[in-house]
Amino acid sequence: MARTVSLWRREAVFLTAMLATETGVVGISTLFKVATSKGLNLYAFLGYSYLLASLLLLPSLFFTDRSRSLPPLSLSILSKIGLLGLLGSMYVITGYIGIEYSSPTLASAISNITPALTFILAIIFRMEKVSFKERSSVAKVMGTILSLIGALVVVLYHGPRVFVASSPPYINFRQLSPPLSSSNSDWLIGGALLTIRDIFVSVSFILQAKIMSTYPAAFTVSFLYIVSVSIVTSMIGLVVEKNNPSVWIIRFDITLITIVTMAIITSVYYVIHSWTVRHKGPLYLAIFKPLSILIAVVMSAVFLNDSLYLGCLIGGLLITLGFYAVMWGKANEEKDQLLLVSGKERTPLLLNG
């Protein structure tokens, strides 16, 4: 009984941590959409926020991972973390450009394909097993297909508005910024970029799991990763904006608030992800993505005066059904493995008796 209670508490910690990170990610996406209308440059935003995040995380290295027995930080591990940083840079750049073209709601809807993509990659890299004789495997495969179909619906079918938001009395958003709406062509471009982002995200989940299996130091890995992203995004920004140095000047308004908020969320986000992927695997990280669309719809309606379109609703529903199918299959698979281990533990006791 005590073991069961302890297990449930442990699961509750993972669940709460992941829900908090997803809420933070959607929140910063919404804030970024507002800040860009006030002149915040993407590369300045990423470079400064990741640099500040690394500085916030630096003190933790002196009293966390140093107290543990860890393998040496070899060139191989550093190379993998550097590659992870490159992947991270690509997915944050494509992701935020995609949000500029579309909306945080679309970004959250399309991110629901991450479990499906991660599952496919996990099979390729032998982190997940598939047997069509087992219901759990069939559920995971069908859920993957359903999620991909849903993502295509969200991107390719805009549809009529099913919910038209209006600014609440206490936020007159039209005075803060121009209307943040997207044309059909922008919606398609944004959807394509966000899909590319989620491919990078899924690959990074797999690589992160590989790194944490050989070097299980969440704070150190997160710090080095964040530093890598800061360097890569800043270098790209210096090249892209070489004729426009004024973009690196940050004003004391919502742009600064966005950068500081992003830094705080980033420093916590990647530590939680590294810690979770070590104990639960890459698919566990990915299955929380569908929940972000519910958060995004509320935040976009309240803060961005965005409307909800039929294509996003239908696609989001299909993706969510696919998500729960994958999650059900994963849960049943873990349950079967636990029963198998328990049976093996009891067998020697019966023989000794």
From Swiss-Prot:
It holds the Pfam family EamA. InterPro entries: EamA_dom, WAT1-related. It comes from the Eukaryota. One of its GO terms (cellular component) is membrane. Keywords: Membrane, Transmembrane, Transmembrane helix. The keyword Cell membrane does not apply. The chain crosses the membrane at residues 12-32, 43-63, 81-101, 105-125, 137-157, 187-207, 219-239, 252-272, 283-303, 308-328. Residues 27-155 form the EamA domain. It is found in: Membrane. GO terms for molecular function: transmembrane transporter activity. It is a multi-pass membrane protein. Belongs to the drug/metabolite transporter (DMT) superfamily. Plant drug/metabolite exporter (P-DME) (TC 2.A.7.4) family. PANTHER family: WAT1-RELATED PROTEIN. This is WAT1-related protein At3g28100. It comes from Arabidopsis thaliana (Mouse-ear cress).
